[in-house]
């Protein structure tokens, strides 16, 4: 897989970004871009969910070599932990040192309304699934890079964008959580909830990649708002907030050493 990327792009960067549902505007800022479809990469998983196109975009952003994954994989698509994290393994082989993981998430915190952004300083695995080949116990302190968190906060402040820190909760999906489940996660300290991201965080930490997780809060979680939840609504709201979200990511990338 890595050989194909090197052959087609001559990529020599250290920063990668994974885009969540409906989040893709940042790629319009990439110069000298090359697009590689997932389907053309040997042994690479394929996306099946709306809002996840399924391509790698490589190029430069403010003269910085960058790799962007448009589309990710989820447990509910039938993939294993190992398959979900194939992109992270690939990034490591490509020499990636910094990873920005994004997602569209439901807010469980009334102080973090839809349209705001959240940087994860901790996470909660509500699936109780793990890499079957790696039962190693790890400290949570290695998962979320403090310097990147500070960089995200200062970048958002510069752009006058509201950003909060909080705990991201991972659920299996594809069904949205019940109000009772949301109530329980809020009681345990959760601030945002989604169906992805944590396997990527764990694998990146194992591989020594410094990781930042950013959530675009697209809706309130079940039981907080009276509106019924749909994936289409999540994607539409993500697209509505995508410009400001992308600007924050660009500012962060510009500041990474």
Model-derived regions, located:
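Metabolite-binding pocket within alpha/beta catalytic cores that recognizes anionic/polar moieties
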Residues: 1-140
């Amino acid at each position: 897989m890595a050989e194909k990327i090197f052959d087609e792009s001559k990529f020599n960067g250290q920063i990668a970004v994974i885009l969540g549902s409906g989040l893709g505007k940042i790629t319009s800022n990439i110069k000298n871009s090359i697009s590689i479809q997932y389907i053309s990469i040997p042994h690479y998983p394929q996306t099946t969910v709306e809002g996840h196109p399924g391509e790698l975009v490589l190029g430069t952003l403010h003269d910085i070599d960058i790799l962007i994954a448009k589309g990710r994989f989820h447990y509910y698509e039938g993939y294993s932990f190992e398959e979900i994290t194939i992109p992270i393994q690939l990034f490591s082989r490509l020499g990636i040192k910094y990873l920005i993981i994004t997602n569209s998430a439901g807010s469980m915190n009334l102080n973090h309304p839809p349209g705001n952004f959240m940087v994860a300083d901790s996470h909660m695995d509500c699936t109780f699934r793990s890499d079957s080949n790696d039962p190693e116990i790890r400290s949570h302190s290695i998962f979320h890079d403090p310097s990147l968190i500070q960089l995200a906060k200062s970048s958002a402040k510069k752009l006058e964008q509201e950003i909060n820190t909080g705990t991201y909760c991972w659920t299996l999906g594809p069904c949205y959580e019940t109000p009772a489940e949301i109530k329980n996660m809020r009681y345990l300290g959760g601030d945002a909830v989604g169906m992805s991201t944590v396997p990527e965080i764990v694998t990146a930490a194992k591989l020594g990649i410094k990781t930042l997780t950013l959530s675009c809060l697209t809706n309130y979680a079940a039981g907080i708002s009276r509106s019924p939840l749909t994936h289409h609504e999540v994607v539409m709201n993500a697209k509505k907030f995508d410009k400001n979200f992308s600007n924050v990511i660009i500012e962060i990338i510009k500041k990474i050493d």
